[in-house]
Protein backbone atom coordinates (compact mmCIF):
# COMPACT_ATOMS: atom_id res chain seq x y z
CA UNK A 1 0.00 0.00 0.00
CA UNK A 2 1.56 3.36 -1.01
CA UNK A 3 2.38 5.78 1.78
CA UNK A 4 0.63 9.18 1.71
CA UNK A 5 2.97 12.17 1.34
CA UNK A 6 1.74 15.23 3.23
CA UNK A 7 2.12 18.36 1.09
CA UNK A 8 2.40 21.96 2.26
CA UNK A 9 1.50 25.08 0.29
CA UNK A 10 4.50 27.22 -0.71
CA UNK A 11 4.05 30.99 -0.81
CA UNK A 12 5.79 34.04 -2.22
CA UNK A 13 6.49 37.12 -0.08
CA UNK A 14 3.03 38.50 -0.91
CA UNK A 15 1.34 35.35 0.39
CA UNK A 16 0.41 34.05 -3.06
CA UNK A 17 0.57 30.31 -3.70
CA UNK A 18 3.54 29.34 -5.86
CA UNK A 19 3.45 25.56 -5.49
CA UNK A 20 3.60 22.67 -3.06
CA UNK A 21 6.31 20.56 -1.47
CA UNK A 22 6.39 17.48 0.74
CA UNK A 23 6.20 18.53 4.40
CA UNK A 24 9.27 16.42 5.16
CA UNK A 25 11.37 18.62 2.84
CA UNK A 26 10.33 22.10 3.98
CA UNK A 27 11.49 22.17 7.61
CA UNK A 28 15.24 22.48 7.08
CA UNK A 29 17.94 25.13 7.44
CA UNK A 30 16.57 26.71 4.22
CA UNK A 31 12.85 26.48 4.90
CA UNK A 32 10.73 27.99 2.13
CA UNK A 33 7.91 30.34 3.09
CA UNK A 34 4.79 28.22 3.46
CA UNK A 35 1.23 28.29 4.77
CA UNK A 36 0.37 27.05 8.25
CA UNK A 37 -2.04 27.89 11.08
CA UNK A 38 -2.09 28.03 14.88
CA UNK A 39 -5.07 27.46 17.14
CA UNK A 40 -5.65 28.47 20.75
CA UNK A 41 -8.32 26.25 22.32
CA UNK A 42 -10.28 27.30 25.40
CA UNK A 43 -12.47 25.33 27.78
CA UNK A 44 -15.81 26.42 29.28
CA UNK A 45 -13.97 28.13 32.17
CA UNK A 46 -11.93 30.32 29.80
CA UNK A 47 -8.67 28.45 30.34
CA UNK A 48 -6.36 27.94 27.37
CA UNK A 49 -4.99 24.55 26.40
CA UNK A 50 -1.19 24.58 26.18
CA UNK A 51 0.66 21.54 24.92
CA UNK A 52 4.22 20.36 25.25
CA UNK A 53 5.53 19.23 21.89
CA UNK A 54 6.57 15.59 21.81
CA UNK A 55 10.31 14.96 22.07
CA UNK A 56 10.26 13.27 18.65
CA UNK A 57 9.01 16.39 16.82
CA UNK A 58 11.39 17.80 14.18
CA UNK A 59 10.97 21.45 15.20
CA UNK A 60 11.08 22.69 18.79
CA UNK A 61 10.78 19.26 20.44
CA UNK A 62 9.83 19.33 24.10
CA UNK A 63 8.81 22.99 24.29
CA UNK A 64 5.44 24.29 25.42
CA UNK A 65 3.24 25.90 22.80
CA UNK A 66 -0.31 26.91 21.96
CA UNK A 67 -2.94 24.18 21.68
CA UNK A 68 -1.96 22.97 18.21
CA UNK A 69 -0.63 23.99 14.81
CA UNK A 70 -0.74 22.51 11.36
CA UNK A 71 -0.58 23.00 7.62
CA UNK A 72 -3.60 23.07 5.32
CA UNK A 73 -3.36 20.63 2.43
CA UNK A 74 -3.38 22.10 -1.08
CA UNK A 75 -6.94 23.24 -1.90
CA UNK A 76 -8.12 22.48 1.66
CA UNK A 77 -10.33 25.08 3.33
CA UNK A 78 -8.46 26.58 6.29
CA UNK A 79 -11.33 25.97 8.75
CA UNK A 80 -11.53 22.35 7.62
CA UNK A 81 -7.77 22.05 8.19
CA UNK A 82 -8.12 23.44 11.73
CA UNK A 83 -10.85 20.91 12.56
CA UNK A 84 -8.90 18.07 10.94
CA UNK A 85 -5.72 18.84 12.84
CA UNK A 86 -7.53 19.21 16.19
CA UNK A 87 -8.87 15.70 15.75
CA UNK A 88 -5.58 14.24 14.48
CA UNK A 89 -3.31 15.77 17.13
CA UNK A 90 -5.57 16.09 20.17
CA UNK A 91 -8.56 13.81 19.50
CA UNK A 92 -10.57 16.99 19.96
CA UNK A 93 -13.78 18.30 18.43
CA UNK A 94 -13.97 22.11 18.25
CA UNK A 95 -16.79 24.62 18.28
CA UNK A 96 -16.85 28.40 17.84
CA UNK A 97 -13.71 28.50 15.67
CA UNK A 98 -12.77 32.13 15.00
CA UNK A 99 -9.93 33.70 12.99
CA UNK A 100 -8.23 36.23 15.30
CA UNK A 101 -4.87 37.04 13.67
CA UNK A 102 -5.30 36.61 9.90
CA UNK A 103 -1.92 38.06 8.92
CA UNK A 104 0.42 36.52 11.51
CA UNK A 105 3.81 35.69 9.98
CA UNK A 106 7.08 34.65 11.55
CA UNK A 107 10.48 33.14 10.89
CA UNK A 108 12.46 31.42 13.63
CA UNK A 109 15.41 29.03 13.91
CA UNK A 110 15.56 26.33 16.58
CA UNK A 111 18.66 25.10 18.44
CA UNK A 112 19.32 22.43 15.79
CA UNK A 113 19.25 25.03 13.01
CA UNK A 114 15.84 24.01 11.65
CA UNK A 115 13.90 27.03 10.38
CA UNK A 116 10.17 27.73 10.58
CA UNK A 117 9.14 30.29 7.95
CA UNK A 118 5.38 30.62 7.86
CA UNK A 119 2.41 32.76 7.10
CA UNK A 120 0.35 31.38 9.93
CA UNK A 121 -3.20 32.67 10.55
CA UNK A 122 -4.16 32.26 14.21
CA UNK A 123 -7.52 30.86 15.33
CA UNK A 124 -9.33 30.71 18.64
CA UNK A 125 -11.77 27.88 19.40
CA UNK A 126 -13.69 26.21 22.21
CA UNK A 127 -13.23 22.53 23.07
CA UNK A 128 -16.42 20.54 22.55
CA UNK A 129 -14.94 17.22 23.74
CA UNK A 130 -12.22 16.07 26.16
CA UNK A 131 -8.59 16.13 25.03
CA UNK A 132 -7.08 12.78 23.99
CA UNK A 133 -3.66 13.65 22.50
CA UNK A 134 -1.53 11.45 20.28
CA UNK A 135 1.77 10.82 22.12
CA UNK A 136 3.87 11.27 18.96
CA UNK A 137 2.49 14.84 18.76
CA UNK A 138 1.98 15.93 22.38
CA UNK A 139 4.15 15.03 25.37
CA UNK A 140 1.80 16.58 27.92
CA UNK A 141 -0.84 19.28 28.22
CA UNK A 142 -2.39 21.67 30.72
CA UNK A 143 -5.37 23.98 30.89
CA UNK A 144 -4.14 27.35 32.20
CA UNK A 145 -5.48 30.83 32.79
CA UNK A 146 -4.13 33.15 30.06
CA UNK A 147 -3.15 35.64 32.77
CA UNK A 148 -0.84 32.98 34.24
CA UNK A 149 0.55 31.86 30.89
CA UNK A 150 1.75 35.30 29.84
CA UNK A 151 4.16 35.89 32.77
CA UNK A 152 5.44 32.31 32.45
CA UNK A 153 6.32 32.95 28.81
CA UNK A 154 7.83 36.35 29.66
CA UNK A 155 10.10 34.84 32.36
CA UNK A 156 11.11 31.63 30.52
CA UNK A 157 10.70 32.27 26.78
CA UNK A 158 13.18 29.48 25.96
CA UNK A 159 10.65 26.94 27.30
CA UNK A 160 7.98 28.03 24.79
CA UNK A 161 7.68 28.01 21.02
CA UNK A 162 8.69 31.23 19.28
CA UNK A 163 5.31 31.51 17.56
CA UNK A 164 3.53 31.43 20.92
CA UNK A 165 5.81 34.11 22.37
CA UNK A 166 5.03 36.29 19.34
CA UNK A 167 1.28 35.58 19.31
CA UNK A 168 0.52 36.27 22.99
CA UNK A 169 1.29 40.03 22.92
CA UNK A 170 -0.97 40.36 19.88
CA UNK A 171 -3.80 38.39 21.50
CA UNK A 172 -3.51 39.91 25.01
CA UNK A 173 -1.75 43.29 24.65
CA UNK A 174 -2.61 44.66 28.12
CA UNK A 175 -1.54 41.54 30.01
CA UNK A 176 1.56 41.08 27.88
CA UNK A 177 2.71 44.68 28.41
CA UNK A 178 2.28 44.31 32.17
CA UNK A 179 4.34 41.08 32.14
CA UNK A 180 7.07 42.57 29.94
CA UNK A 181 6.20 40.35 26.98
CA UNK A 182 4.93 43.13 24.70
CA UNK A 183 8.41 43.79 23.31
CA UNK A 184 8.42 40.33 21.73
CA UNK A 185 5.70 41.41 19.30
CA UNK A 186 8.05 44.04 17.91
CA UNK A 187 10.55 41.39 16.74
CA UNK A 188 10.64 41.34 12.93
CA UNK A 189 8.73 38.32 11.63
CA UNK A 190 10.75 37.63 8.51
UniProtKB/Swiss-Prot annotation:
It comes from the Bacteria. Pathway: Isoprenoid biosynthesis; dimethylallyl diphosphate biosynthesis; dimethylallyl diphosphate from isopentenyl diphosphate: step 1/1. Its EC number is 5.3.3.2. CDD domains: NUDIX_IPP_Isomerase (cd02885). GO terms for molecular function: isopentenyl-diphosphate delta-isomerase activity; metal ion binding. InterPro entries: Idi_bact, IsopentenylPP_isomerase_typ1, NUDIX_hydrolase-like_dom_sf, NUDIX_hydrolase_dom. This is Isopentenyl-diphosphate Delta-isomerase.
